[in-house]
Every structure is written in structure tokens, then in C-alpha cells.
């Protein structure tokens, strides 16, 4: 069972490979487009696609609210590729099963890496994390195995939650 923050082509890819995928999208236009793809590919039974408007002053973060409703230890993977990445990544750590995967796309914009990235807008070790929430996330996942991938334009990281963690 997986959770995807930010729907798109990856929604179809993951839906074909997992038992059930919940996906949250903030763009109404993009939500409709992905919903059409899901119907055309006959994946409706395997995908629950949610629309969550962006947060406004005085209105709680809808992405974060959706993540908080998920039972702890219930997800095999989380893909973070949408808005509020820092808050969502941090909140998702407890939602993963032991050995679960937390995948963050475009991570070079938010977290530095030991071996510097050549991706544009990459964070240096000197600059550190992009926010206090990212710093907290980095500390929380420091003991997790990490697999970094880059195509020179963007970086993606897979964090593997420790067994028993």
C-alpha cells in the first residue's frame, strides 16, 4: 500500500505495481487529467485520487491533514513529489512500515548531500537544509539507509526505514 503526494505519470506507474495507491493532488486541472488516465487504464479499483486545495491563512494544510489520518506503520512506501514536501516528508516517517520506502523527488532543492550534486539549485553542505522542518527530517532519518540518484538535472532519494524502526 502506498501514498503519493503529487499525482502524475508516477500514479499510473505505481498503481500497476502495488495493491493500492492513495494519491493527493492540489491542482484541480491536473487532478482531472490524472483521473482520466486512471479511468482509461482501468485502474480505478487500485487508486484513490484525492483533491486537496492549497492551504490558505487560517485553513490547515490539506496535504498534511490527509497524511495525519493514515494509521502509523501502514504504508509500504510514500512518494513525496508535491507541495509542502518538508511537512509531508516529516509526517510520513511514522506512517511507514519497518523497511518501508520514503521517496523524495527533486530532493536537491531541500537537502544537501555528502557528495555534492550537479543539479541546478542544489543545496550545498554549507547552505544546509532548506527549512527547519527539513533539518528535523534530516536528523530523524540520519540512521536510515539512503539511495541517491541523479540525472544531472534533478536528484531523487529513497530513504529506507530501519527494520524495527
Task: Give the label of every model feature segment.
Residues 11-15, 31, 35, 67, ...:
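Short amphipathic alpha-helical segments and helix-helix/interface helices
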Residues 6-9, 82-86:
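Short beta->alpha connector loops
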Residues 77, 83-165:
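C-terminal substrate-binding/active-site "lid" region of AdoMet-derived donor-dependent transferases
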Residues 1-2, 22-24, 76-80, 103:
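Short catalytic-loop micro-motif centered on adjacent basic/acidic residues
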Residues 53-69:
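Surface-exposed interaction regions that form or flank ligand-binding interfaces
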Amino acid at each position: 500500500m502506498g501514498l503519493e503526494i503529487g499525482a502524475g505519470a508516477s500514479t499510473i506507474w505505481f498503481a500497476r505495481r502495488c495493491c493500492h495507491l492513495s494519491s493527493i493532488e492540489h491542482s484541480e486541472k491536473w487532478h482531472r487529467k490524472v483521473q482520466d488516465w486512471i479511468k482509461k487504464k482501468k485502474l480505478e479499483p487500485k487508486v484513490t485520487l484525492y483533491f486537496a486545495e492549497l492551504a490558505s491563512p487560517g485553513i490547515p494544510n490539506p496535504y498534511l491533514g490527509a497524511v495525519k489520518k493514515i494509521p502509523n506503520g501502514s504504508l509500504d512506501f510514500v512518494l513525496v513529489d508535491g507541495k509542502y514536501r518538508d511537512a509531508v516528508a516529516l509526517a510520513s516517517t511514522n506512517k511507514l512500515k519497518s523497511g518501508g520506502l520514503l521517496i523524495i523527488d527533486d530532493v536537491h532543492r531541500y537537502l544537501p548531500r555528502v557528495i555534492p550534486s550537479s543539479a541546478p539549485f542544489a543545496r550545498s553542505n554549507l547552505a544546509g537544509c532548506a527549512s527547519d522542518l527539513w533539518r528535523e527530517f534530516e536528523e530523524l532519518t540520519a540512521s536510515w539507509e539512503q539511495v541517491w540518484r541523479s540525472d544531472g538535472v534533478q536528484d531523487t532519494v529513497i530513504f529506507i526505514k530501519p527494520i524495527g524502526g
